[in-house]
A protein has these predicted regions:
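Conserved alpha-helix/loop element of class I SAM-dependent methyltransferases that forms part
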Residues: 57-76
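Class I SAM-dependent methyltransferase Rossmann-like catalytic core
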Residues: 43-61
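A short, conserved alpha-helix within the catalytic core of class I
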Residues: 158-169
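A conserved beta-strand element that flanks and buttresses the S-adenosyl-L-methionine
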Residues: 151
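Conserved beta-strand signature within the Rossmann-like core of class I S-adenosyl-L-methionine
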Residues: 175-185
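Short alpha-helix
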Residues: 196-215
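Class I SAM-dependent methyltransferase SAM/SAH-binding core
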Residues: 87-138
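N-terminal auxiliary segments of SAM/dcSAM-dependent transferases
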Residues: 1-34, 249-303
Length: 303
């Protein structure tokens, strides 16, 4: 997909077109790609906040139900991450409901525009101890065992066929628990399953977790979901703590896997000699955002 086409795609979206289906058809593709998902969600930016403002009841019920999962686990949690944070409509309304509010709150999304909306939404909710950035679910710019509790809310959803890949990457960064709120294909009706297959939604998340030997401590239909044709399944995975590392700087370069440091308002890896920009407050930490800057830390004033 060429970036020159974005304005055409935006016009199709404005007229009510299904962007994911359009992009798949135009590329003769069976499954969703990262680029298709990014374009689709970037175009939708702002809609989730608008929906929650107009329909606060569902969000309140959903985040309350999610908070009960965290509170039931009851561990001391220093850090939390929402993968696929979107516009932070879940994260921002979940945090105040937690009995133990983490010191560090993280969230990332593939789409820059969604993260930009999320930043403002978190500010309006007066939740300020957050770090939101762009990132890739399959190449997360975070170190191993760096986040106490990692959770998703229909974020793995459009990645059918990549369930194992997603689980392995999520477990890599998880220190204690991974909480997955994703399409419950195994709990869905025949009609709902057919719809999930049409949209390219995941359907083998639980079986993938079992085949990988992960410690699934809970798996059931979640109490709250907005669409009966896309029921939410809950899966909680506990990570064996014996090999966990203590991580002080969780951010890593998605290419070299070396630590990132905030230098001159950008994130730089001294070992990898790559720099990642911060655009309007949003750190851009996708592989494609990397800029080669072998002399980034030079003292240019001495020229």
């Amino acid at each position: 997909m060429k970036k020159e086409s974005l304005n055409i795609i935006k016009n199709i979206y404005a007229k009510g077109g299904n962007i994911i289906q359009y992009l798949k058809d135009s590329g003769n593709l069976k499954n969703n790609t990262d680029e298709i998902i990014m374009i689709s969600y970037d175009l939708q930016s702002g809609n989730y906040i608008k929906y929650v403002k107009e329909n606060p009841e569902f969000n309140e019920k959903y985040t309350l139900a999610v908070s009960k999962i965290f509170n039931k686990i009851g561990i001391k949690c220093n850090s939390i991450l929402e993968v696929g944070v979107g516009e932070a409509t879940t994260l921002a309304n979940l945090i105040p409901k937690l009995q133990n509010i983490p010191k560090k709150i993280y969230g990332f999304d593939l789409a820059w525009s969604r993260v930009r909306y999320a930043l403002e939404y978190m500010k309006k909710k007066n939740i300020l101890n957050t770090f939101l950035f762009t990132g890739d679910l399959f190449n997360i710019p975070l170190a191993d065992d760096s986040i106490d509790i990692v959770y998703t809310s229909h974020s793995i959803e459009p990645n059918r066929g990549r369930e194992k890949e997603a689980l392995l990457e999520l477990m890599r960064i998880t220190k204690k628990y991974l909480i997955l709120l994703e399409p419950g294909y195994e709990f869905a009706s025949a009609e709902a399953q057919k719809r999930m297959e049409k949209h390219g939604y995941i359907k083998n998340l639980y079986s993938s977790a079992i085949s990988l030997g992960l410690k699934v401590i809970e798996h059931r239909l979640f109490d709250i979901y907005s669409n009966p044709l896309n029921p939410t399944g809950l899966m909680i995975i506990e990570k064996d703590p014996k090999n966990n590392k203590d991580v002080h700087n969780p951010l890593i370069c998605p290419i070299t896997k070396t630590p990132l440091e905030l230098i001159r308002n950008s994130f730089f890896t001294k070992e990898g000699l790559l720099v990642y920009p911060i655009i309007d407050g949003v750190p851009c930490l996708l592989r494609d955002n990397a800029i080669i800057a072998t002399h980034y830390v030079d003292n240019f004033e001495n020229i």
